Amino acid sequence: MKKLAISIGDINGIGLEILVRSHEELSKICTPFYFIHESLLDKASKLLNLKLFNAKIVAFKDGKDYEFNFVKKENSLEIYSFYLPLDFKVDENFEIKAGEIDTKSGLYGFLSFKAASYFVYEKHAHALLTLPIHKKAWEDAGLKYKGHTDALRDFFKKNAIMMLGCKELFVGLFSEHIPLAKVSKKITFKNLSIFLKDFYKETHFKKMGLLGFNPHAGDYGVIGGEEEKIMEKAIAFVNAFLHSKKDEKFFKKALKDENLQKELLLNFKGKGVYLPHPLVADTAFTKTGLKNCNRLVAMYHDLALAPLKALYFDKSINVSLNLPIIRVSVDHGTAFDKAYKNAKINTKSYFEAAKFAINLHSKA
């Protein structure tokens, strides 16, 4: 079976309860390695009145050699150690504060995530599944990252792409956790062309559409000009480049050379993988709109995620593309209001994420 490295997220939220409640079923489809120390797992288990049996847990420690070792078997748990450069002291001896933003739980969740990421990178597991973190807890802990995807870019020096959804609808985000006021400045021919090229090469979706940035997709330039001045040009260029089968070196050269762009367009005949014009966002998510195209790109976060979660909240997942590792996540937050209350918690997104990672690795 495929091996999944699972980071615990913010332990003050619902992540650990999802992990414990789902372990038996999850173990039927993969071999999970949970990145949590035994002492902290014991505290959480007592609060939840739930016990984790027949599981593998990894105690992550600061070190230089990425060494992975079996330590012992105790109370049906297989305990391992994994050493990596962490830049922070690992503190597992803190109190769990259910439903609260806390610097210690924020930092611990980050270190669990970093260790699990490199565990996969070092080929000890096939994919990474992350449970939800709290961004404010990360910030209060002195971390510079806005979330998992932002951190993965830094870890691996790659331009990670965030994609969310399910088989009925997937959406790639051109911009993620940045203020709305900064999005328009990010939309340039170069930035968008690189994104569209990379998004296709990671997904190989056969038909994709870009959601317009402005209301009514700009109404032929009446409302803003990004659609006609930038987006349509980037779409045409990327469609022509993908059709040409030329290499990455040519792409980088053509980005700066209008004559090469014109040459590509002259030689391009037929349909591209991207629809030629941006879609009007307020109708793209209707039944008719999704029947036409259900693989979309959004210029900013809420343009896509508000309708996606309204339609498919329970089954949507988060996928990080364009990285040297496979990373998936649940598409929901820490749910502090439900943490450690034995509330009814939906685990569908968790299982969908695990299945997606397993299938993606099988196709790789």
UniProtKB/Swiss-Prot annotation:
Coiled coil: none annotated. It holds the Pfam family PdxA. Substrate binds at H148, T149, K309, N318, R327. It is found in: Cytoplasm. GO terms for cellular component: cytoplasm. It catalyses: 4-(phosphooxy)-L-threonine + NAD(+) = 3-amino-2-oxopropyl phosphate + CO2 + NADH. Pathway: Cofactor biosynthesis; pyridoxine 5'-phosphate biosynthesis; pyridoxine 5'-phosphate from D-erythrose 4-phosphate: step 4/5. GO terms for biological process: pyridoxal phosphate biosynthetic process; pyridoxine biosynthetic process. InterPro entries: PdxA_epsilonprot, PdxA_fam. Its EC number is 1.1.1.262. A divalent metal cation binds at H177, H216, H301. GO terms for molecular function: 4-hydroxythreonine-4-phosphate dehydrogenase activity; cobalt ion binding; magnesium ion binding; NAD binding; zinc ion binding. Keywords: Cobalt, Cytoplasm, Magnesium, Metal-binding, NAD, NADP, Oxidoreductase, Pyridoxine biosynthesis, Zinc. It is an enzyme of class 1 (oxidoreductase). Its cofactor is Zn(2+); Mg(2+); Co(2+). Belongs to the PdxA family. Homodimer. The active site is located at the dimer interface. HAMAP family: PdxA_Epsilonprot. Catalyzes the NAD(P)-dependent oxidation of 4-(phosphooxy)-L-threonine (HTP) into 2-amino-3-oxo-4-(phosphooxy)butyric acid which spontaneously decarboxylates to form 3-amino-2-oxopropyl phosphate (AHAP). This is 4-hydroxythreonine-4-phosphate dehydrogenase. It comes from Campylobacter jejuni (strain RM1221).
